[in-house]
């Protein structure tokens, strides 16, 4: 499967999922905190699925373009005010506490992730002889799985609450000890799964 077909397939799959999740929020009153995390995991596992089962030859430039695929995947959300279908899709990620900056936070979150992952991957391959694809996947899993489990667990089981600041803002957000522990435990599990990357 070539690059273009793969990216179009991922794009369509993401948007079908977005529409389903948006309808869950609209018709079934499912909490956005849950649907947003399903989105969160889809941005990790959909590309991973295609990379595993439908690989294609990745040159340096193609790999870089592919790593920025989330930009054009999320881009249609910019036009949500003009299209009711896109509005419905947006419901699945639009947390009340993020409004009116929901899309800005999404773009900056993923751009910042790429800015961290790429240098780490390059340094790991050049100085430690670890394939950049492996270390890149490791870092992505650390960030997305840890954070992905924190919010649903905190919302469903959280009893012990505390407030903390988000990065680069003075706004305080409510978090739970249970959610934070879920992030810690799932992050440690990712480290265990990827233990083969580390030296003794």
Regions found by a protein language model. Give the residues of each.
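Interhelical loop and helix-boundary elements at the membrane-water interface
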Residues: 2-8, 21-62, 74-200
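Selected alpha-helical membrane-embedding segments in polytopic membrane proteins
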Residues: 68-74
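Alpha-helical transmembrane segments
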Residues: 10-17
């Amino acid at each position: 499967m070539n690059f273009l077909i793969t990216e179009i397939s991922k794009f369509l799959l993401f948007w079908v999922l977005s529409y389903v999740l948006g309808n869950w929020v609209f018709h079934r009153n499912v909490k956005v905190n849950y649907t947003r995390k399903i989105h969160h995991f889809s941005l990790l596992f959909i590309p991973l699925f295609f990379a595993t089962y439908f690989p294609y030859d990745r040159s340096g430039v193609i790999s870089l373009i592919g790593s920025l695929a989330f930009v054009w995947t999320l881009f249609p959300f910019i036009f949500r005010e003009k299209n009711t279908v896109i509005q419905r899709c947006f419901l699945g990620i639009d947390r009340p506490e993020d409004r009116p900056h929901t899309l800005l936070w999404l773009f900056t979150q993923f751009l910042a992730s790429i800015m961290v992952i790429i240098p780490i991957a390059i340094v790991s391959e050049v100085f430690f002889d670890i394939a950049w694809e492996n270390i890149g996947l490791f870092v992505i899993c650390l960030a997305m799985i840890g954070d992905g489990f924190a919010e649903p667990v905190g919302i469903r089981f959280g009893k012990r609450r505390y407030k903390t600041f988000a990065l680069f803002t003075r706004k305080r957000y409510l978090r739970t000890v249970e959610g934070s522990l879920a992030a810690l435990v799932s992050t440690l599990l990712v480290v265990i799964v990827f233990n083969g990357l580390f030296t003794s």
